[in-house]
């Protein structure tokens, strides 16, 4: 787990799981008060760097289909949409977009 702090406050965190040489960004979150200031990008850069240090060459993540801000961030970090899990999320029901960055 990687956390980012500013002025002693945790402003975001992310977690990477590595299995069989592949990395999965399991969680990434930025506190609403800190959004739009590049913390999400910093966390993604840390996840990719951490993955590389662990020998990962491919990374994946899933995101709510309606979270266009996150999808744009992930795409700018080299992730591409590869699949959709229909009705994956509950409350509200929403599809999950599966994204991969192959060859990090």
What are these regions (language model features)?
Residues 46-47, 85-88:
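Hydrophobic, well-ordered secondary-structure scaffolds
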Residues 37-38, 93:
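Non-catalytic, surface-exposed connector residues within folded enzymatic/regulatory domains
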Residues 57-60, 64-71, 77, 87-104:
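C-terminal "cap" of GNAT-fold acetyltransferases
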Residues 1-33, 41-46, 50-54, 102-104:
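Acetyl-CoA-dependent GNAT
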Residues 81-83:
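A secondary-structure capping/hinge motif
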Residues 38, 42, 46, 68-72:
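Alpha-helical macromolecular-interaction surfaces
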Residues 31-37, 65-67:
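Active-site acidic-Proline motif in GNAT/NAT acetyltransferases
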């Amino acid at each position: 787990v990687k956390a980012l702090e500013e002025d002693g406050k945790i402003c975001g965190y992310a977690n990477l799981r590595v299995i069989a040489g592949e990395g999965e960004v399991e969680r990434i979150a930025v506190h609403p008060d800190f959004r739009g200031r590049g913390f999400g990008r910093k966390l993604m850069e840390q996840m990719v760097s951490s993955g590389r240090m662990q020998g990962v060459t491919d990374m994946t993540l899933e995101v709510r289909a309606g979270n266009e801000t996150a999808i744009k961030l992930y795409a700018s970090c080299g992730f591409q949409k590869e699949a959709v899990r229909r009705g994956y999320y509950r409350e509200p029901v929403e599809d999950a977009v599966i994204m991969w960055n192959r060859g990090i």
